[in-house]
């Protein structure tokens, strides 16, 4: 029985020259020479580069099948690994047998025909776009980053916690949530006041898709000390931008007995760890992004790893922006939420390095962030990266029950709705901190792909839930 190998193993020299091997994949291109040879570029997704298979016209199905192969056909090719005289790859396959597993029905109308497609067009055929160079490379980088995140936390002694996707609480207090209901929309039950009676719904109360796993994560951090969540989150924001998705993935660590300084250190260590991993493990894909998408991809990651994070208080950051002499689209004053242009000025022009901005005004931050002694600011932080702006947002959590209750009431929230969250402060409360990393934002940063819809397999956005 001939050994079956992935193309990456053949190209990386794990199969000896002269060994017979079978590869399975899809045709990227076929070209024929007058000398009675066909050159098949075959990919299987295991790496960026295809392998070249040389097929002689003495193969039994050469005329009937090999010469009919087009982009997208699936093949099983058995042959001998030989040194390649061609530039760009060390080895190729001298084919002895070509079996066609699947034909492309009509090559003329095949949506992934061998030509340059716009990234916008690829979104319309999201079920086929993984076959392209760019989306295949994004998928491998996404996998590498996810594995590196899990590895980092495991090595640091964190436990992964699966927080629920269905919830009754709004972590952000923003109200932009997707409702989960089995009620008959044609015949909604009403209470005495005419409002929808959610007590008759599946969960017996109003329920939503989660906007964050943080609150649930805190409960486990207050028992296991160090945890993280990594899963999908949902926002019903009507935002049609290159930066927003209705469904996206979040990485949310939570640490007991931790301060804002511990939080910032964890964020720095994690980002540098995953960037080192992707530079090491996905060189082939990053070289493609560097050549075709963003020339600075590799140098940006290397600079990030080699930079010490700057730290600045929000109040001082506002002063830096006011003194910059720059005319910003959004005016700068104490109390504003920093916009992307402000964040990028700080990271790219002022500090020329990643920067942690901390201690934000309480009025622009969430109820669970720890109130500072000045009574005006909270122990919040944002990590700003050159080239994108905010990449991580986090805070030290409010561990004092009386202060937490007061903040909730100030923000129009009912403390009773958060009774279980408040219990953490009643029974052995502890200073703790955590942050959120939008996973797709991270992939955008690493690949240079500008639209967030192109770094998630099936993007969900306003009026778009195809596939």
From Swiss-Prot:
Its EC number is 6.1.1.22. GO terms for cellular component: cytoplasm. GO terms for molecular function: asparagine-tRNA ligase activity; ATP binding; nucleic acid binding. Keywords: Aminoacyl-tRNA synthetase, ATP-binding, Cytoplasm, Ligase, Nucleotide-binding, Protein biosynthesis. Gene3D superfamilies: Bira Bifunctional Protein, Domain 2 (3.30.930.10), Nucleic acid-binding proteins (2.40.50.140). Pfam families: tRNA-synt_2 (PF00152), tRNA_anti-codon (PF01336). PROSITE patterns: AA_TRNA_LIGASE_II (PS50862). Transmembrane segments: none annotated. Coiled coil: none annotated. Its main location: cytoplasm. GO terms for biological process: asparaginyl-tRNA aminoacylation. It is found in: Cytoplasm. It catalyses: tRNA(Asn) + L-asparagine + ATP = L-asparaginyl-tRNA(Asn) + AMP + diphosphate + H(+). CDD domains: AsxRS_core, EcAsnRS_like_N. Belongs to the class-II aminoacyl-tRNA synthetase family. Homodimer. This is Asparagine--tRNA ligase. It comes from Pasteurella multocida (strain Pm70).
